[in-house]
Amino acid sequence: MFLTGVMSKMGLYGFLRILWPLFPDELHTFATPLLWLALGGVVLGAFAALRQTDLKRMIAYSSVNHLSYCLLALFAVAAAASPADEAATVSALSGTLLQMFNHGLSATALFFCIGFLETRSGALR
């Protein structure tokens, strides 16, 4: 539960704390290819989650999907807004942090429920 609730967000948090403030012009320059990579993560994470028969793996792949949505939002505002556009940057950061927090709570609760079901039934499929 700790892995999905906290550790999976560390890369995105590091991006927000290091890359965004130090390299805003470069981020604006490379935002379009990064947008495509994030969109690929959204699509591939969703399809990988749909193919799973194990519930824990399904939640893990949907976590990849949700974190790709966060990256997609950040790269979209980096592509659309200039680095000096304070209102768009604050809105994107606030929305991304809220999504990260909500995903941490919901994914942890889902893994807790899956563990309970596994204990009660003995199977995850």
Where are these regions (language model features)?
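Hydrophobic transmembrane alpha-helices and their helix-loop junctions in integral membrane proteins
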Residues: 1-125
